[in-house]
Each structure stands twice: as structure tokens, then as C-alpha cells.
């Protein structure tokens, strides 16, 4: 399944979460898109709930189904709780950490920065959004990209960097200090439902 590249507003409203991180999608119309949107929220089956939870998390991180399943399988090989490990691996993606550091307003914008070669890891250019960053690695902006307007605007509007990431706005670089705790990850996701979905 290819990654969805269309408008995120409809997906956000259908799933009941803000994929952009701004919350604007749900402010005016907190219901699914369509003529009968307000009446479309119906009780889902157990399978429907599991599928919806999977779609929420997959769209939140902007990952296609093949990548999503591969990360899920990798998480199952780790010690600890499968669902939590899964979310930690998603959070460890390079595009996500660029977003978390405030270098991009959305994960989609962060993915573009990585794809276009503007981002470095430990001083080396990395243009793979799915690159799995390890704790202790340093993420930065290439010298020739430091004056990009999109980065400046994003940093000006960002006022929060999670505790598991450090960021130096003057150097335009940050460190993935440690793996996040579950309490620091999206609370609107019930990852146990996703584990159940793939265990069917």
C-alpha cells in the first residue's frame, strides 16, 4: 500500500485525531467528512476498533503499510512490551525526530527536509526519512540549508521539545538523548489494539 499523500484534514476528521498536530482540523468540524458527517460516528466492531487504531497510528507517523508492518515485526523481536516497543521505534524515525526538534511544523514537512538532503546525522547527510536514529546520535541541518525559510518559520512557532530530545537553536542541531517513556508518547493511541489486529 502506497503512502497517502493527499489532504490530511479529511483523514484527521475520519479518524478523530489531528494529523498535523495543530488541532485545526477538528475545531470547526469534529466529525467525519461527508454530507452526513455528524451522524456517521457509529459503534464499531472489535475488528473495526483495531483497524481504526492501526490507521490512526499509521497516518500519524505517515508510514505506508509495508513499512508499518515491518516496524511492528521488529518491535516484536525486542525485549519488553510489544506495543510500547512499536511506538518507540516509530518515534525513533529520523523524519519524526526532525519534527520533534521543531525543524518542521509537521511530520510531512520533516520528511521533505530529509528527502531533499537538508538533514545530517552525526555530521553525515542522511536522506532516508525512515532512518532509525539511535540514542546519542546528533541530528543537524546542513550548512547550506541553515537559512531555509521553512526551518526559520517552524522554529519561531515551536515552543516545545520533548524531554528525550535536546536541541540547540543556535547550532541547529539536537541529540536523541534516550528512548521515550510510554507516558511521553501519543496518549490518544491504544497500541494494544494494534497488537491484537496483527495477531488475528
UniProtKB/Swiss-Prot annotation:
Disulfide bond entries: none
UniProt keyword annotation of rRNA-binding present: yes
Role noted for this protein: One of the primary rRNA binding proteins, it binds directly to 16S rRNA where it nucleates assembly of the body of the 30S subunit. With S5 and S12 plays an important role in translational accuracy.
Gene source species: Halalkalibacterium halodurans (strain ATCC BAA-125 / DSM 18197 / FERM 7344 / JCM 9153 / C-125) (Bacillus halodurans)
UniProt record similarity statement: Belongs to the universal ribosomal protein uS4 family.
Subunit details: Part of the 30S ribosomal subunit. Contacts protein S5. The interaction surface between S4 and S5 is involved in control of translational fidelity.
GO biological process, any: translation
Name this polypeptide is given: Small ribosomal subunit protein uS4
One Gene Ontology cellular component annotation held by this UniProt entry: small ribosomal subunit
PROSITE patterns given in the database record: RIBOSOMAL_S4 (PS00632), S4 (PS50889)
Keywords: Ribonucleoprotein, Ribosomal protein, RNA-binding, rRNA-binding
Gene Ontology MF terms: rRNA binding; structural constituent of ribosome
Region Disordered: start-end pairs: 22-41
Every S4 RNA-binding domain range: 92-152
Gene3D superfamilies reported in the protein's UniProt record: Ribosomal Protein S4 Delta 41, Chain A, domain 1, RNA-binding S4 domain
